[in-house]
A protein has these predicted regions:
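Small/aliphatic-rich secondary-structure junction motif
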Residues: 1-53, 154-220, 239-241, 268, ...
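Local beta-strand N-terminus motif with an aromatic residue
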Residues: 3, 106-108, 129, 138, ...
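A short acidic, glycine-rich active-site loop
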Residues: 54-68
Length: 278
């Protein structure tokens, strides 16, 4: 039986290697394979000065260097020996290669690293990669640079209980929590502490859907400062993983919209973020 793969974009930085180590941990527990991808861009040169030939030579040299870096990575990351993996490289942006891999392989999830506030800005607001997160049909796990390797014992799910057409959207999270024997805190942030009839009905449906894993419900009354409320909850309840659903006009857009506090989202670069596909 062909195993689904966990896709890991890697640039050989400490940040991406940390994300890789988290992906290895997940792959071992879920019995999955890893697919490592590296993207590179060849400098543009003028054709009239032999640019085509020069670009070919530069690309070949870059591929040789990347091949050497992959071999060095395998030697310096002994954890890789515990899982099946393959690696590939390609010319283009990282998001281009992610799209291609999602088309060509059976991908379970994407695991990617981020360099603090700058990195989360590049990942979530960059024109290409942000569109990957918003439109991909697999979960994306973002690992902050200083997060270390997590066992994800305590997971927080932010939910507004609205516009959820299919509860299967939560299945990747349930599988993740079941694998790590984790507890899920389902948090509803609201401007008041009362749920509407629609929200109560959806909460009951979610309750039934989550019966396989340990979970609890929490309603938090906040005004407009959702980011402080989430950060406080994470710190007070020792949350290892924050889970969100990217839909228009919900808390995800409040946090990641152009005019929001995106650059502070990493919460001191310690809390991984799981984004579920819609």
């Amino acid at each position: 039986m062909i195993k689904k793969k966990i896709l890991v974009p890697i640039d050989f930085s400490d940040c991406s290697i940390n994300a890789l180590k988290n992906a290895i941990n997940i792959a071992k527990k879920m019995d999955r394979e890893l697919l490592l991808i590296n993207a590179f861009l060849v400098p543009v040169t003028h054709v009239e000065f032999g640019g085509a030939t020069m670009m070919g030579e530069i690309a070949h040299e870059m591929e040789r260097n990347i091949e050497m870096q992959f071999r060095r990575l395998a030697k310096e990351t002994p954890e890789l020996k515990s899982v099946d993996y393959e690696y590939t490289m390609g010319h283009g942006s990282a998001s281009d290669l992610v799209y291609a891999a999602l088309e060509d392989h059976d991908i379970l999830m994407v695991v990617m690293g981020t360099h603090g506030a700058k990195g989360i800005d590049e990942i979530l607001l960059g024109s290409n990669t942000y569109s990957v997160i918003k439109s991909t049909d697999v979960p994306v796990l973002v690992i902050p640079e200083n997060a270390g390797v997590h066992n994800f014992n305590k997971i927080a799910l932010t939910s507004d209980y609205k516009d959820i057409d299919n509860l299967k959207i939560f299945d990747p999270l349930i599988q993740f929590a079941d694998t790590f024997h984790a507890e899920i805190d389902v948090i509803h942030f609201s401007s008041n502490d009362k749920l509407s009839h629609e929200e109560i009905d959806m909460a009951k449906n979610i309750e039934n859907h989550f019966k396989k894993v340990r979970h609890s419900y929490h309603v938090s009354e906040v005004s407009d400062n959702f980011e402080e409320a989430i950060e406080a909850y994470i710190n007070e309840h020792n949350i290892d993983l924050l889970t969100m659903i990217p839909r228009k006009h919900n808390i995800f857009d409040k946090l990641f919209g152009e005019s929001s506090w995106t650059r502070r989202m990493v919460f001191h670069s310690k809390t991984p973020l799981l984004i579920l596909p819609t």
